[in-house]
């Protein structure tokens, strides 16, 4: 009996010691977040939730965002995956260990999403090791941070109308009856819901993840291939399985291959800098159509990254400095429409871009910052980022996803 009592007392003491150690560990975690940066995106996201404890994401601190307040019951039940080491150039960098449910992320956008202008050579320091981010885009960075499947569905030069059409938010239809014979091409007309002719440069929809055959679309759940000649559109069946003729009727919906195949849990949208909209309300309606088509309410809206006087709505502004890191007219409209789902990416890049990738500001950067402009070291040209800029952009998207509880 006494022996049993001693055993029980010992167990209680051991449990108490364990709880004390865990408590000390949790306390250390909260008091020693890298760089002590609790505001994260708050400077560039006016409506951020003050209850969230947020740290900047830096190369030294890819997991600094994990807080108990943000942990949901689903997170606690999710399987813990030890992320494998990823070979980056000649250096192996550990991704660490994160808790998440395996999800898919679809990044739809234009050349900014595609990653036009990424650097041939770009390196930063990660945990004392050199990390090669040459050629990285923001979806690459997002995949690095989350460990999830990320689709780069960016196409250079596309307008917001074209992106929304490619994603399926704005629908396409067969304009008139046509018969497609096996192995033969026939002219076809495709229109939108208003009857306007549709001619996309990329009908398969995959953009940066374009390892598929060109211009594949689904009509009535059958795969077809489109071709262009003399400003006309032609269609034929895809593959060798079709033996007879296929009759396509007027009004049948046409869906890009990517819109058909990619059923993402999380949507990240970036568009508008190439036009395709005549009012902020029209652009917002395009975003909303894409969100509705996706079937998910887990989405992030990335604000335009151009300096105000170089943006699509540049006539609204006399100088960049008058706007600074405040929301401009365009950003205000998006924030009012989408609330906490919106990132003022331009302001983030001004306030935190250089710090996120560990770059010291040059004289030109300091001049840019003083005049409310995105630092030159992050850019390839006036509108596109280099890999440092895209890395910082991806880190900001990751942080927003943390705030929203997406990963």
Regions found by a protein language model. Give the residues of each.
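Substrate-gating cap/lid alpha-helix
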Residues: 69-70, 78-85, 90, 291-293, ...
């Amino acid at each position: 009996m006494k022996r049993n009592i001693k055993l029980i007392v010992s167990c209680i003491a051991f449990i108490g010691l364990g709880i004390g150690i865990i408590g000390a560990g949790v306390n250390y975690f909260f008091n020693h977040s890298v760089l002590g940066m609790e505001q994260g995106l708050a400077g560039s996201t006016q409506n951020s939730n003050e209850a969230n404890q947020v740290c900047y994401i830096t190369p030294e601190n890819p997991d600094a965002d994990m807080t108990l307040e943000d942990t949901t019951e689903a997170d606690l039940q999710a399987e813990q995956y030890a992320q494998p080491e990823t070979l980056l150039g000649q250096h192996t960098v550990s991704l660490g260990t994160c808790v998440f449910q395996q999800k898919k992320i679809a990044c739809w956008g234009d050349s900014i999403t595609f990653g036009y202008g990424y650097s041939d050579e770009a390196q930063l320091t990660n945990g004392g090791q050199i990390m090669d981010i040459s050629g990285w885009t923001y979806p690459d960075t997002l995949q690095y941070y989350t460990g999830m499947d990320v689709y780069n569905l960016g196409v250079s030069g596309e307008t917001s109308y074209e992106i929304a059409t490619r994603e399926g938010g704005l629908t396409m239809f067969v304009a008139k009856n046509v018969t497609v014979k096996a192995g033969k091409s026939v002219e076809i007309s495709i229109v939108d819901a208003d009857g306007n002719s549709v001619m996309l440069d990329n009908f398969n929809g995959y953009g940066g993840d374009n390892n598929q055959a060109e211009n594949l679309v689904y009509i009535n759940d059958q795969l077809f291939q489109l071709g262009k000649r003399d400003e006309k559109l032609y269609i034929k069946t895809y593959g060798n399985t079709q033996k007879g003729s296929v009759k396509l009727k007027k009004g049948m919906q046409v869906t890009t291959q990517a819109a058909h195949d990619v059923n993402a849990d999380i949507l990240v949208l970036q568009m508008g800098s190439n036009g395709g909209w005549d009012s902020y309300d029209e652009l917002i309606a395009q975003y909303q159509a894409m969100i509705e088509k996706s079937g998910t309410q887990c989405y992030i809206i990335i604000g335009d990254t151009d300096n105000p006087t170089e943006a699509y709505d540049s006539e609204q502004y006399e100088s960049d400095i008058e706007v600074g890191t405040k929301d401009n007219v365009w950003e205000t409209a998006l924030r009012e429409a989408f609330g906490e789902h919106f990132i003022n990416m331009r302001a983030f890049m001004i306030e935190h871009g250089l710090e996120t990738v560990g770059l010291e500001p040059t004289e030109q950067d300091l001049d840019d910052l003083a005049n409310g402009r995105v630092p030159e070291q992050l850019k390839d040209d006036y509108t596109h980022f280099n890999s440092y800029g895209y890395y910082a952009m991806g880190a900001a998207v990751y942080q927003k996803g943390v705030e929203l509880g997406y990963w």
